[in-house]
From Swiss-Prot:
Binding site for Mg(2+): E71
Reaction(s) the record says it catalyses: XTP + H2O = XDP + phosphate + H(+); ITP + H2O = IDP + phosphate + H(+)
PANTHER family: NON-CANONICAL PURINE NTP PHOSPHATASE_PRRC1 DOMAIN-CONTAINING PROTEIN (PTHR34699:SF2), PTHR34699
Name of protein: Inosine/xanthosine triphosphatase
Protein residues bound to substrate: E71, A72
GO molecular function: ITPase activity; metal ion binding; nucleotide binding; ribonucleoside triphosphate phosphatase activity
Entry cofactors: Mg(2+); Mn(2+)
Claim: Cell inner membrane is one of the keywords in the record: no
Gene Ontology process terms (BP): nucleotide metabolic process; thiamine metabolic process
Length: 179
């Protein structure tokens, strides 16, 4: 018996993002074979988005680019960013999912950031580089991320993306009530 295939284009070749997409879709559609393909998709925002709106726009820009340059069943984009909220600085990710001319936007959990980390970001550094320097790691953004380091591995960048993707899929899982 041949298994049906769901093709997902991910707006990044970062293995954390591609794996999160595969994990989310495998959990949601266990009866299907999930084919995830990473694509270099420009965000159109700074390399380190420093606002909620830039982060959201980066995810939307990536998913739009993927739709224009590849054929798939679903298009996923994840954009990590930071902002300074009333309770302090935090990092988070926006999720954009496109399917059949519909778009769903979601956001991952907020991770409070140490003030010294946020100050380095304000000075123009990227979060992954700051965390690598602070924790003496190499390319942490393609591994557990700041989330993994600051939670001692109890959560990771990938687990946060996986959960956020599953939540952002709700309109596609229940199209009859998301009109």
């Amino acid at each position: 018996m041949q298994q049906n295939i769901i093709k997902v284009i991910v707006g990044s070749k970062n293995p954390v993002k591609v794996n999160a997409a595969a994990n989310a879709m495998t959990l949601l559609f266990p009866e299907y074979q999930i084919q995830t393909i990473g694509m270099d998709a420009p965000s159109g925002v700074p390399a380190q988005p420093m606002t909620d709106s830039d982060t959201r726009q980066g995810a939307i820009n990536r998913v739009n680019y993927c739709q224009q340059h590849a054929e798939a069943d679903y298009y996923f984009a994840m954009e990590g960013g930071v902002d300074h909220f009333e309770f302090g600085p935090a990092t988070f990710a926006y999720i954009a999912i496109a399917h059949q001319q519909r778009l769903s936007i979601g956001r991952g959990a907020l991770l409070p950031l140490p003030r010294q980390v946020y100050q380095a970001l304000e000075a123009g550094e990227e979060l992954g580089h700051v965390m690598d320097r602070l924790f003496n790691t190499v390319n942490i953004k393609q591994k557990g991320g700041a989330i993994g380091l600051l939670t001692h591995g109890h959560a990771t960048r990938e687990s946060n993306y996986t959960q956020a993707l599953i939540l952002a899929m709700a309109p596609f899982l229940n199209p009859e009530i998301y009109l």
